[in-house]
Amino acid sequence: MNHEVMNLFNPQSPAQTFDSIRISIASPEKILSWSYGEIKKPETINYRTFKPERDGLFCARIFGPIKDYECLCGKYKRMKYKGIICEKCGVEVTLSRVRRERMGHIELAAPVAHIWFLKSLPGRISTLLDLTLKDIERVLYFENYIVTEPGLTSLKLHQLLSEEEYMLAIDEFGEDQFTAMIGAEAIYELLASMELEKIANDLRAELSETTSELKQKKLIKRLKIVENFLESGNRPEWMIMKTIPVIPPDLRPLVPLDGGRFATSDLNDLYRRVINRNNRLKRLIELRAPGIIVRNEKRMVQEAVDALFDNGRRGRVITGANKRPLKSLSDMLKGKQGRFRQNLLGKRVDYSGRSVIVTGPELKLHQCGLPKKMALELFKPFIYARLDAKGYSSTVKQAKKLVEKEHPEVWDILDEVIREHPVLLNRAPTLHRLGIQAFEPVLIEGKAIQLHPLVCTAFNADFDGDQMAVHVPLSLEAQLEARVLMMSTNNILHPANGAPIIVPSQDMVLGLYYLSIVSEKEPGEGMVFSDIGELHHALENKVVTLHTKIKGRVKNIDKDGKEVAKLYDTTPGRLIIGELLPKNPSISFDIVNQEMTKKNISKMIDQVYRHCGQKETVIFCDRIMQLGFSHACRAGISFGKDDMLIPDSKLRLVAETEALAKEYEQQYNDGLITQGEKYNKVVDAWGKCTDRVADEMMKRIQAVEFDPKTGRQRPMNSIYMMSHSGARGSANQMKQLAGMRGLMAKPSGEIIETPIISNFKEGLTVNEYFNSTHGARKGLADTALKTANSGYLTRRLVDVAQDAIISAVDCGTAKGLTMQPIVDAGQIVASLGQRILGRTALVDILHPVSGEVILEGGAMIEEADVAKIEEAGIQSVQIRSALTCETRLGVCAKCYGRDLARGTPVNQGEAVGVIAAQSIGEPGTQLTMRTFHLGGTAQVVDSSHLEASYEGTVEIRNRNVVRNSEGHLVVMGRNMAILIKDGSGKERVVHRISYGAHIFVDDGDVVKCGQRIAEWDPYTRPILTEVEGYVGFEDMIDGLSVTETADESTGITKRLVIDWRANPRGADLKPAIIIHADKKGEAIAKYKGAEARYMMSVETILSVEPGSHVKAGDVIARLPMESAKTKDITGGLPRVAELFEARRPKDHAIIAEVSGTIRFGRGYKNKRRIIIEPNDETLEPVEYLIPKGKLFHFQEGDQIEKGDYILDGNPAPHDILAIKGVEALASYLVNEIQEVYRLQGVLINDKHIEVIVRQMLQKVEITESGDSGYIPGDHVDRIELDEINDNLLAEGKRPASGNPILLGITKASLQTPSFISAASFQETTRVLTEAAVSGKIDTLQGLKENVIVGRLIPAGTGGTIAQIRRIAAVRDDLIVDEQRKSGNNEVAKAMLTNMTTVTTVE
C-alpha cells in the first residue's frame, strides 16, 4: 500500500527501451511538433518579481510551472488540480521538471541556412547545388543574386548576378522573363526544386563515361551526398530553416546571485539576439521598409542564428559583456568540457572519498586500511538501515542523530556493515585497469588510507604524499563484480605481458637477497641439518650465520602426494625462504637455491601461480613480503660515501682515450677524415672508455675480500647489493657515482664531444657541471610534454579498439601468422617460445626429425609445449591471430588465445581491445616520465661489426664479393646474407650484410661462438667500384657540382659534391665517377655489359683523384651518415604514434613492386627515372622517380626482388600492405613498435599490438563496384563486403572488389559505424553533420555508445545479460506464435503488450 501512495504523487514514467538511435535532419513540421509554443519576446524574467515574462524565453505558459503543481498566478495549488490549465495565466498545473523537457520555437520572418550544412566540410549545400561555398555565401549574405529560373533569356541557371548586373538584366529582358533571387530564400527554392533521383542517375551515367580522375572524384563526392539524401528520406530544403527550436529553459538556467544580479547561460544571450533581430525584421517588413534595410536585417538574423548554432564558425566571434566568446550549441558538445566527454563518458559519483595513503605492511593482500571517519561517512545509508533493523532508531532522523553523536553501538554496527563489503581504491592517473582494485576494508584510527605494499607496483603508487580515492559499490551485483573481478587477489598477473605484477620491490627484495647470499669461510661451514627446527636452534646460538655453506634436508611431496626429502647444498637463509614455498611436486627447492634478485623472485612467484593456483600464491606473496621486510630491517644495510669505489685504472683508461681523441684530431687536421667522421670516432672512443671504466668499477665493487684477522669474508658492498638485487638503483647510476659520467646530450639530441670525466664522488668541474645541466633540463622539459602526448596516444588507442570484444568461441578461420624468433645483430631479442606462449596453433606442429605431432592444430600452446617445441629446435610456428580472425563483430577466443591476466583461455565478453590499448599506452606514460632518470647521459646506439652467436658452418646466400687492393673481401651485393648452420644442417641464424662491409669468413668456413664475421663503418656509406681501372670524373665542375672545401682549422682540402640543381647552369649535369679501362682514359670499362659509371649524390665526399688506379672493391666515394643520435623513448613515443597513425615517414623508403631488372630512363630536371622490367613477361614495367642527389644503390642491369628497397629509409606502411600483403605489414608494425618498447626494457605481448592493427585494417577501398550499391572509393568493412559479395554471387550477379587499406588510429576511430562513438572522439560537428545527412542509425554495438546512452556495456557481465535478453526475446516470439496457432489470440495479445518493443529513437 505504502508504495502505491508514494507513486501517486511521483508517477514514474516507464523508461522507454530502445535498440538503436537514429539521427536525421529535423523537418520544419518535426520542430513544430516538438514545440509547446512560440517565443515572441526576448525578455527572460521580471527582475522585481522573479517571475518569467509571458511569451519570453522562460515563459511558464509554454514550458511549464516554476513550482510543482502550482500555476504562476497562484490560483491553482496542490495535487488535486493536476492537469488543469489556469485560465488566467495559461499555465498547466503539473511537475516543474517538465521545464527540462518541453521545447519552444521561434518563427523566423525570413529563412536562414543551417551553418553546419553550409560550412562543415565538405559543405553539403554547396556540393548538392554544385556551386562553390564562396558563391553560396555571397547569395546567403546578400551580396549577389542567383538565377533560379532563366526562362528564355541568355542567362544560365545558378548564374550569380551583382546588383548592377541584375538591374541591367531586368532592363534588358524585362522583369517577368526570368527569376533571380537573393538570400536564403533563393537557396531554399533551388534545394526544394531538386529532383534527387534524376540527378543521381545523371551522375552515374556521367561517371561511367568520364576518364579524368579529378572529375571522377568530384562526381563521386556529389553522388555520395545525393545518395545519402535519397536513402535517409531527408529533403535538401530542410538544411534551410524557417523555424528554430528553443531548448527547454532548465537546460539554460538563469540563476539569481546575491546582490540582485543574475548568472545566465550564454545560450539565453544568443537566443535573445535572434529574437530581437527577428522581431525587428518582422516590424520592418510590416512597415514596408526599403529593400536594402530589410536585406541588412535578414543578414543580421542569419548571423545571429549562425552564432547560436556555432559561434565563430563564420565571421567574428560574438562576445558577451566581459569580452568572452559566448558558448554556442556546438561548443556545448565539443571538446573535453563538452557534453560527451565531461558528462556522458565520465561522471562524478556519489559514495566516494579521498585521502593520503600510507603503507600497511601488516595487512593481508586483500585488505586495505580505511579510516573510521571515512567509513562512517561512506557507509551511512547502510548504517541507518542496520540501526533501524536492530531497533536502535525508528526513523532516519533518529539514526542520523545517533551517527552524528558517534554512539558506541554505531561503531559495532559499522563493523558489521563493512564486513565482507569490498571497497574500490583508485589512484590517478588510471593508466590501466590495475589502477582501480577492490579491497576489503579494515577500520583504522587516523586519517590516512593504508595500502598493501605489494599492490604499489600496479597502482604505480609510492608514499611520498600520493592520494587515493575510495568508492563504495552499492548494489549486490556491484559488490559481486568487485569481489570476483576486481579484488586485488584476482589481479596477480600483468594484463600486458602475463608476468606477475604482485612482486616484492625495494626493501623486500633487499631482505630476500640478503637472505640468499652465500659467503665463504663462515662459522659452521659444511654442517648438515635434518630439519628447519635444528637450523633455527643453530642460528639462535650463532653456530652458523645466514650465509654459511651447509647441507640441508628439504621435504616436498611427489606426484602421488607422498612426502619425499632431498639433501641440498645451500645456506640457512635460503632454507628459511624455502620453508615458505608451497609443497608441490612441480616446485623444487632449486628455485629458491639461488641469489634472490627481483627477476628470480618474479620467476618464483610465476611458478607458484602456475602450479599451485591463486590462493596459495596470495598466501605465499604475503609471507615473503613479511620475511623480506623483517630481514631487510635486521640486516641494516645502508651505505656511505666510502662504499663508492673508484677504480684505480680509471686514470689510465682516460689518458689512453685522450690520446686516441688527439690522434683523431690529428687525422682530421691532416685531412684523412672529415669533421663528421672525427666527431663520430671521438664520441665512440669516449663511449667505450666510459663503459670500460664502469666495468672496472663493477669488478671492484663485486670483488669478494677476506678479512686477514678473522679469515672471514668481508660483508658485501651495500651499493652493489642494492643495484644487483634490483631493489634500487641501476648500473648506470652507479657508473655516474663512482665511474665517470660520460657523454652528455644536448637538448637537440646531439652528443657533446667532450665527456664528463669526473663522477659525483669526485665532484664535477664548473665546465662539466654546465655541460650536464644542458641534458638534465631537457629531461625535465620532456617529461612535462610527453606525459600529455602519451595520454593522448592512449585515448586514441582506446577509441579505436573499444569495440574489439571476445564475441565468439571459434571463427574457424584457416588463416594465421607465422612466428619466428626476433634476432637483432646476432642476438636473440625475443625467443620463439616467448612469442608463441598462450597462442593457438593454426596447424599441427610436427617434430622436424621424427615427424611426430608435438601439438595439434587448434590447441593452446602452454609452457610445457613451448619447452618441447624449443627442444625440437623448431624455428617457426604458425599461430592464429586477432589479425586474421573472421568474426563479424569483435574477435574470437581461439584467435586471441590466453587471457594474460588469468593464465587461462580468454572468456567470452572480455574487452580485449581496451586491454590492448591500456597495455600499449600505460608504459608510454611511464617511460616518458622516466626519461630524465639517467640525468641526460647519452647512450650511443650503433654497431659496427658482427660476431657469430652460434658455432657452426658458414653459408653465404647471393654471394657477391671481391678482394680490394688491401686484400680484404668486400661485399658488393645488395642482398647478401650470411647463414650459420649447426651440425645437423639446420639454420641457426641469418645476418643480412650491408654493401661495402668487409667479411672475414667465406663459404664453408667453420666459426666459433663470438668470432668476428664482418665489420663496416657505421658512419659512412661507401660507393665501391666493381671493376679495375683508372678513375675519371664526369660533369664534376668546380663550383657547380663539386666544391673543394678547405677546412678552416686544418687547411686541408677535400672534394665534396654539392647540390648542382640549385644553379640554373647546372640543371643538366649528372656528376659521376667513371672507370677507364686504360691510362689514356678513352675506353670506359664494362661491368655486366653496362658502363662502369657511378652517379654521385649530394654531400658525397670523393675519395679518389682523377687518373688514379683502383681495384674492384675499392672505395671511390663516401656518403656520411647522420651523426649518432641518442636513442631514448623521447624518440620512441612519437615513433609509436607515427606507426599507429600509419603516417608516411619523411624521406620514406621506396619499395620495388615487382621482381625484375633495373634500367635507367630519361631523367627530369631534378628527378631520376628508374624502370624495373619485370621477370614475369605478363606484367607492365614499373617506373619510379627518385630525387637526384639521393643515394641510389643499384646499377643498370642489376636484379631486384619484389619488396627490396630501391631507396633506403623507413618504409611507408601503406606500401608494405600494397606490395607484400597483410601479414608482412602486421609483422613490420608489430616488430617496429616492439623495438621501441624493448629499448626501454618494457615487455608487451604481441597480441595487444595485433588487436590494434586489426582495427586499423578493418576497411577495404572499393575499386570495382560490380552489381553492389557501392561507389568506387567507398570505404567498407571487409567482413561486410565478403557477406555482400557472397549474396551477389548466390544471385548470379557481379561481386564488388576492393583493396585492403590501412587507416591510422584517428581515422579508424572516426570511421566507426557508430556515430555516437565517433562524435564523442573528435570533430564532433563534422561527424554529426555527416550522420544527420545520411540518416545514420547507431545500433549501439560498441562500449562507448552504451556508456553514453547510460546502459550496461556489451562486455563482461553486461554482455551476458544482453545475451540472456536476446534469448528471452526469441523464446517469447515462439510462445506468442504457438498461442496464436492454437487460437488463444487473447493470451497472445496480452503477452505482446507486456513484451519489450524494439524502437528506434530519433
Swiss-Prot record:
The keyword Aminoacyl-tRNA synthetase does not apply. The keyword Iron-sulfur does not apply. Its cofactor is Mg(2+); Zn(2+). Zn(2+) 1 binds at C71, C73, C86, C89. GO terms for cellular component: DNA-directed RNA polymerase complex. Binds 1 Mg(2+) ion per subunit. Binds 2 Zn(2+) ions per subunit. DNA-dependent RNA polymerase catalyzes the transcription of DNA into RNA using the four ribonucleoside triphosphates as substrates. Belongs to the RNA polymerase beta' chain family. NCBIfam families: rpoC_TIGR. This is DNA-directed RNA polymerase subunit beta'. It comes from Bartonella henselae (strain ATCC 49882 / DSM 28221 / CCUG 30454 / Houston 1) (Rochalimaea henselae). The lineage of its organism: Bacteria, Pseudomonadati, Pseudomonadota, Alphaproteobacteria, Hyphomicrobiales.
